[in-house]
């Protein structure tokens, strides 16, 4: 049963670093009323959501006004952003929003992170980039 006291937002770049994004979102839904993405690239968010079968309640650009609007739209007791940067993002208001670095949140929740050096998707992308460079 979802908690009605929390909204969780993931930066797209952060959730992409998890080994099983769908499982992470499903688990986050156990704790939160609303779960969504913050990203500047709507197309990438749509592709990511489709490929990983992720249902999101919202998707916004990373601006202070958008994040403040989320707080007004989802009137939960807590609003949490999980991101990849060590420092709190500039767009995140100091009040009413908590910030957790993905590595810390993953450790606390038991989520596995991708090994970016050996991920099959990363290996394929790297190989494909080399192929295209050799053709030019």
Model-derived regions, located:
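Asp-based, Mg2+/Mn2+-dependent phosphohydrolase catalytic module
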Residues: 1-32, 68-78, 85-136
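Structural recognition of the conserved hydrophobic beta-strand(s) that form the central parallel beta-sheet
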Residues: 34-39
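Substrate-recognition "cap/lid" segment bordering the active-site pocket of phosphatases
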Residues: 40-79
């Amino acid at each position: 049963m979802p908690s009605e006291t929390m909204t969780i937002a993931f930066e797209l770049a952060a959730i992409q670093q998890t080994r099983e994004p769908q499982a992470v979102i499903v688990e986050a839904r156990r704790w939160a009323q609303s779960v969504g993405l913050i990203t500047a690239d709507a197309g990438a968010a749509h592709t990511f959501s489709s490929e990983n079968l992720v249902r999101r309640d919202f998707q916004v650009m990373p601006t202070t006004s958008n994040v403040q609007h989320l707080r007004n739209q989802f009137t939960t007791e807590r609003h949490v952003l999980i991101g990849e940067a060590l420092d709190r993002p500039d767009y995140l208001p100091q009040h009413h929003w908590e910030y957790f670095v993905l590595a810390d949140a993953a450790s606390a929740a038991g989520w596995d992170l991708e090994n970016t050096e050996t991920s099959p998707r990363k290996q394929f992308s790297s190989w494909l980039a080399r192929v295209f460079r050799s053709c030019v």
